[in-house]
């Protein structure tokens, strides 16, 4: 399974790590799932987010890019990140 997860408001909420979500994502990775950090951040702000995640014990498999399996399945690399599950604070409720 491929899981795409946002950073601001999702993995980090008001400067605090969402430990419960981070733990669940680590469990998913141990099961063999792929986790993509899917964020609008770039440059220094993206580097800060990655450092924040590392300090909180999490490293995504990919950052703002499709995984090779998805690229092969889609026969190309579209701009939209392909995932089976999207986790984002802005999702419809």
What are these regions (language model features)?
Residues 82, 87-93:
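Asp-based, Mg2+/Mn2+-dependent phosphohydrolase catalytic module
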């Amino acid at each position: 399974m491929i899981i795409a997860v946002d950073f601001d408001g999702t993995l980090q909420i008001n400067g605090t790590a969402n430990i419960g979500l981070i733990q669940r994502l680590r469990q998913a990775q141990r099961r063999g799932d792929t986790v993509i950090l899917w964020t609008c951040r770039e440059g220094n702000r993206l580097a800060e987010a990655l450092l924040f995640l590392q300090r909180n014990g999490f490293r995504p498999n990919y950052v703002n890019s499709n995984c090779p399996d998805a690229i092969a399945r889609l026969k190309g690399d579209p701009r939209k990140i392909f995932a089976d599950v999207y986790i984002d604070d802005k999702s419809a409720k």
